[in-house]
Amino acid sequence: VNTAVHQTLVVQLQAGDTADRFPVLAHLGYEAADPFALTVVFSHDGRVLARWVLDREMVTEGLTRAVGVGDVRLRPESRGMWDELRIELLGDHRADGDRHRAVVFVWTAAVESFLRETHSVVRPGRERVCVDDFLAELTAEG
């Protein structure tokens, strides 16, 4: 039985205040041990640009409607004949007081395919977290 799903996608990154997009890799990960989370590592030319942990249900909802407040916001967008998931990520504060910002566009069909694979590992509504293990981990890091 698979307990993990990994997939690498080419996505479009729009960084800063420009409308220009450029391709980067998004390495998606899902582990049954952390059933609510999706991990995304963005890289370009072999260099890690950022690592984010996203809520699986939020990503699913973001395919059909705008969701999120704070650091992560998702919404569906159409670009010509393509349907995309727009992921806005807000980072640390810059010297001028604004926050670092990146927008990533992912082909909707690729996200849906990845989510289907995660659902075959842990079905939505069947997620479980062992509280005792979680508390033991927290106190060990203490």
Where do the model's predicted regions map?
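Short, well-ordered loop/turn elements at secondary-structure boundaries
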Residues: 34-36, 81, 99
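Secondary-structure transition/turn motif
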Residues: 41-46, 88-94, 108
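Charge-rich, low-complexity N-terminal segments
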Residues: 1-39
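Protein-protein interaction regions
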Residues: 19, 66, 71, 76, ...
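Short alpha-helical interface patches
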Residues: 37-47, 56-67, 112-116
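Short, internal acidic amphipathic alpha-helical interface segments
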Residues: 50-94
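Short, surface-exposed beta-strand/loop "edge" segments at domain boundaries and coil↔beta transitions
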Residues: 19-21, 44-54, 94-103
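Mixed-charge, glycine-accented linear interaction segment located at domain edges/termini
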Residues: 92-93, 98-142
